[in-house]
């Protein structure tokens, strides 16, 4: 009985609320038309009352409908050529005119990225935030990515323009990485270095693209594009933000797309460059690495970096810091935070910030196609470089290396190592290469950071 009374009272309150709401809307509409009518009133003319026809209401309704249509996205996509305000690196502001159809096309690209991330499972952790950032920044009228108050612009300015987000990502990667396989077999580091051939080889290719009409890359642009060959998203973003901020969106999307496509791109190259006999090579089990070695290793890497390549210290410093906290074991709370909460939060903001750079006036250029092409070439060269160098080492080594693990020298951790293991198991179901492949894989992370530091030192 009590519940019925309670429901009855609630029903009455709901009806009263709806009635008040309807009255407010009615009063607002009447007031709106009254205001328009007052603004549009003119001095009355003396006319024959029989021929008089009041068209004021029809005119006002037409103007109202036109006004409503003019603030819709449909109108903006079809008819508007909006000015976009953007802040330059020197603090000045530039204005670009962007047609509505270009924004609409970029939104479609954002939807394609959502499909690749959500349905095809291609790097969803970053592709999905990038996709939503792409859609939001190209939303007409809203000004979501415009300087100085658009919220995507604020995210970009706070974490990507000053390079802090990629460095925090590297801390998280360090906290997740086990350098044990590399410590157990140090010569595998050479394969990680060889895989960086794709970076420097594609640097020449990026410069050669200047021969194509409509494409102009500076040396800094070419360096930022070629780093895609390392298959390391945070490093690509870090280098692009320093050397080619205007190309950041295209470079980031290319880097993460090719990282996601590792299982599709690498196997044909691996089969092409190796024989069945080479793919069947069995490697000895790695020795057990002590806790002390794992603790000392990141400190040694950091000191060597400071002594010989200080320009790479921001990336390697963040990586070794995260790894040291993981291995030392006395600050598990900090290590877990880096691995989980901090890494996840920054990944969201990094993706949205990169998506902000996917605005129509930046992405819809011939340069974007050139970046995708050179990025693919760089990735192929990096994969091939690691495989061929492993075969070269086998000429002089008594303990043979399975060349399949050479392809893991690119920085796509741990996807590249898993692909090496998968191809090996296809040839011999008892030949597990995963732990062997992790050696060059984590070495590739260090190698790409060193390559980035060298480029920044010379051209930054």
Q: Where do the model's predicted regions map?
A:
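Low-complexity, proline/glycine-enriched hydrophobic segments characteristic of transmembrane helices
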Residues: 28-99
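Transmembrane helical segments that form the transport core of multi-pass membrane transport proteins
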Residues: 50, 54, 302-386
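Hydrophobic transmembrane alpha-helices of secondary-active transporters
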Residues: 113, 136, 162-183, 322-325, ...
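Flexible hinge motifs at transmembrane-helix junctions and intramembrane kinks/re-entrant loops
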Residues: 114-128, 212, 265, 304-317, ...
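Alpha-helical membrane segments and immediately flanking helix-loop junctions
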Residues: 157, 161-162, 171-179, 191-201, ...
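Entry/N-cap segments of selected transmembrane alpha helices
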Residues: 182-203, 360-386, 437-441
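Alpha-helical transmembrane segments
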Residues: 246-264, 374-382, 405
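Membrane-embedded hairpin module used as a gating/binding unit in multi-pass transport
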Residues: 254-330
């Amino acid at each position: 009985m009590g519940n019925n009374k309670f429901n009855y009272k609630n029903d009455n309150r709901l009806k009263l609320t709806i009635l008040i709401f309807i009255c407010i809307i009615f009063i607002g509409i009447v007031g709106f038309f009254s205001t328009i009518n007052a603004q549009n009133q003119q001095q009355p003319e003396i006319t024959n009352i029989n021929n008089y026809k009041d068209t004021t209401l029809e005119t006002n309704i037409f103007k109202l409908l036109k006004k409503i249509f003019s603030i819709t996205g449909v109108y903006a996509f079809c008819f508007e050529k909006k000015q976009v305000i953007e802040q330059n690196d020197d603090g000045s502001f530039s204005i670009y005119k962007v047609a509505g159809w270009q924004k609409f096309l970029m939104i479609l690209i954002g939807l394609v990225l959502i499909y690749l991330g959500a349905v095809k499972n291609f790097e969803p952790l970053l592709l999905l935030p990038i996709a939503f950032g792409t859609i939001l920044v190209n939303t007409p009228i809203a000004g979501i990515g415009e300087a100085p108050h658009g919220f995507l612009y604020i995210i970009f300015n706070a974490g990507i323009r000053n390079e802090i987000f990629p460095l925090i990502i590297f801390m998280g990667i360090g906290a997740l990485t086990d350098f044990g396989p590399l410590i157990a077999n140090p010569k595998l580091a050479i394969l990680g270095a060889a895989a960086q051939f794709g970076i420097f080889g594609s640097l020449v290719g990026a410069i050669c693209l200047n021969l194509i009409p409509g494409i102009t890359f500076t040396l800094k642009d070419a360096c930022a594009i070629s780093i895609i060959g390392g298959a390391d998203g945070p490093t690509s973003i870090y280098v692009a933000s320093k050397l080619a901020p205007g190309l950041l969106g295209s470079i980031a999307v290319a880097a993460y797309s090719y990282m996601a496509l590792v299982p599709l791109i690498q196997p044909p190259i691996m089969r092409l460059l190796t024989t069945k006999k080479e793919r069947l090579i069995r490697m000895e089990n790695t020795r057990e690495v002590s806790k002390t070695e794992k603790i000392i290793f990141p400190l040694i890497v950091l000191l060597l970096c400071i002594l010989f390549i200080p320009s790479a210290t921001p990336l390697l410093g963040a990586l070794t810091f995260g790894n040291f906290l993981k291995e030392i074991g006395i600050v598990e709370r900090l290590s877990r935070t880096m691995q989980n909460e901090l890494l996840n939060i920054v990944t969201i903001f990094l993706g949205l910030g990169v998506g902000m750079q996917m605005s129509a006036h930046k992405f819809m250029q011939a340069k974007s196609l050139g970046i995708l092409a050179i990025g693919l070439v760089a990735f192929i060269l990096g994969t091939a470089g690691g495989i061929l160098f492993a075969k070269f080492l086998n000429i002089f080594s008594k303990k043979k290396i399975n060349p399949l693990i050479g392809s893991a020298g690119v920085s796509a951790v741990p996807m590249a190592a898993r692909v090496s293991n998968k191809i090996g198991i296809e040839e011999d179901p008892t030949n597990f290469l995963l732990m062997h492949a992790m050696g060059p894989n984590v070495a590739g992370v260090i190698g790409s950071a060193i390559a980035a530091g060298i480029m920044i030192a010379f051209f930054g």
